[in-house]
């Protein structure tokens, strides 16, 4: 008898079965079903027992692993968003798309997007994320080793000095698995040049154990989204009845007592959460007064601000709450300046109007642009897109978003001519010619 122990594979995080169908949890938040077509197989938890002649048993073992690999490549589904998830690995480039991979904007900060998909359904989401999205048709997950390999290439290109890896994306970054390994790998690379790793999060996935592990892995800062303290308002903004603001505040205080810098990032939705926005600011200031952190950002030689106030903007495929008023940044900064003055009169110095320089962000060598806007080029279509009417093509070590397509599935595998519409920050958008 030959045994196949599925628990030895890191990406397989849970195993169930229904008769001869394996139901595998992949990287915590994904799932596949694999029908095992062999009579000689007995499934016992994560152990598959193969009762056959040794040579036949080894062939069956290889066959089962091939079926699992095929299912991950073609039938992966998110348990969070219920969408098909495309597993990204070599040879798909990781530069060119906003939904996954790496984004480099000619600065010392590199945005790391290991996956997309969110466990909340925020009413203001700029990318229409969550289970009830009306525009997103596919999610993506990037293989950890492939992500790190490509990240290191960009860091080396920038000569590895004062680099910040920032985990963000179209979704909740902390849902990526293995998150701790990702942070540790990034931190190991960046610390050679006095760099850091930071992460955006809505906080819902975090717990004491995970925070301890992220601290040990070398995470420098958590940008924690808190948009209201009122329980009813917080649930409404998040689009989830089970959103627990008390749990988020408890997590905030736990982070504050760790070696990870806490930055609270409230979002103002004018005419919706104006009062709650101010309350979140007050909460953050009080927390800093009671428990000041002394964590120094090596990029600046100073402490990071406690607050990163943001203004809700309207985006083409994003959500816009009906009652929300649209403000420009001049009006927003005027409001923040007013709040700063109020604190100054109380003898409290609070920085609410922040800039990238406050976090050590500065210009650095930019990756070359392989395409010019208006250029016509040939592209190999390799994957279905993130939204309806989009497919993904590959050319010159870039992934290209080809928009306004019909019959997307018929294009996959073909070489097509496209016209480049956008190349800013190496985010490449094109249309068929």
From Swiss-Prot:
Keyword S-adenosyl-L-methionine part of the UniProt annotation: yes
UniProt GO MF annotations: 4 iron, 4 sulfur cluster binding; catalytic activity; metal ion binding
Amino acids binding S-adenosyl-L-methionine: 171-172, 236-238
Binding residues for [4Fe-4S] cluster: 118, 122, 125
Domain spans labelled Radical SAM core: 104-349
CDD domains documented for this protein: Radical_SAM (cd01335)
Assigned keywords, A-Z: 4Fe-4S, Iron, Iron-sulfur, Metal-binding, S-adenosyl-L-methionine
Pfam families: Radical_SAM
Protein family (similarity comment): Belongs to the radical SAM superfamily.
Name the UniProt record assigns to this protein: Uncharacterized protein MJ0103
Taxonomic source organism: Methanocaldococcus jannaschii (strain ATCC 43067 / DSM 2661 / JAL-1 / JCM 10045 / NBRC 100440) (Methanococcus jannaschii)
């Amino acid at each position: 008898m030959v045994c196949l122990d599925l628990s030895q594979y890191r990406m397989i995080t849970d195993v169930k079965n229904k008769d001869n169908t394996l139901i595998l949890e992949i990287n915590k938040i994904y799932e596949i079903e694999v029908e095992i077509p062999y009579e000689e197989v007995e499934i016992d938890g994560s152990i598959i027992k193969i009762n056959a002649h040794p040579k036949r048993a080894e062939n069956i073992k290889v066959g089962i692993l091939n079926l699992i690999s095929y299912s991950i490549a073609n039938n992966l589904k998110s348990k969070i968003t219920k969408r098909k998830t495309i597993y990204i690995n070599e040879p798909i480039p990781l530069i060119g798309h906003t939904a996954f991979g790496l984004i480099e904007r000619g600065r010392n900060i590199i945005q790391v997007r290991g996956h997309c998909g969110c466990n909340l359904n925020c009413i203001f989401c700029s990318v229409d994320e969550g289970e009830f999205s009306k525009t997103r048709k596919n999610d993506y997950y990037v293989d950890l080793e492939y992500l790190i390999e490509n990240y290191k290439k960009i860091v080396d290109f920038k000569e590895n000095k004062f680099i910040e890896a920032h985990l963000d994306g179209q979704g909740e970054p902390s849902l990526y698995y293995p998150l701790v390994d990702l942070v540790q790998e990034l931190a190991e690379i960046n610390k050679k040049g006095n760099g850091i790793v930071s992460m955006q999060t809505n906080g819902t996935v975090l717990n004491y154990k995970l925070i301890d592990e992220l601290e040990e892995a070398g995470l420098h800062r958590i940008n924690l989204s808190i948009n209201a303290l009122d329980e009813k308002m917080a649930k409404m903004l998040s689009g989830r009845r089970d959103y627990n603001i008390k749990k988020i505040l408890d997590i905030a205080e736990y982070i504050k007592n760790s070696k990870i810098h806490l930055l609270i990032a409230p979002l103002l939705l004018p005419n919706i959460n104006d009062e709650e926005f101010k309350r979140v600011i007050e909460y953050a200031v009080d927390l800093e007064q009671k428990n000041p952190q002394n964590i120094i950002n090596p990029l600046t030689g100073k402490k990071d601000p406690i607050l990163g106030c943001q203004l809700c903007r309207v985006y083409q495929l994003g959500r816009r709450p009906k009652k929300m008023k649209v403000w420009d940044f001049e009006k927003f900064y005027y409001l923040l300046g007013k709040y700063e003055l109020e604190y100054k009169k109380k003898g409290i110095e609070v920085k609410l109007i922040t800039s990238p320089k406050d976090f050590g962000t500065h210009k650095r060598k930019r990756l070359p642009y392989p395409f010019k806007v208006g250029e016509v080029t040939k592209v190999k279509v390799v994957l279905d897109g993130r939204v309806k009417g989009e497919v993904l093509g590959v050319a010159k070590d870039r992934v290209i978003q080809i928009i306004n397509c019909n019959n997307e599935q018929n294009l996959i595998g073909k070489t097509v001519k496209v016209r480049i519409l956008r190349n800013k920050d190496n985010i490449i958008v094109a249309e068929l010619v």
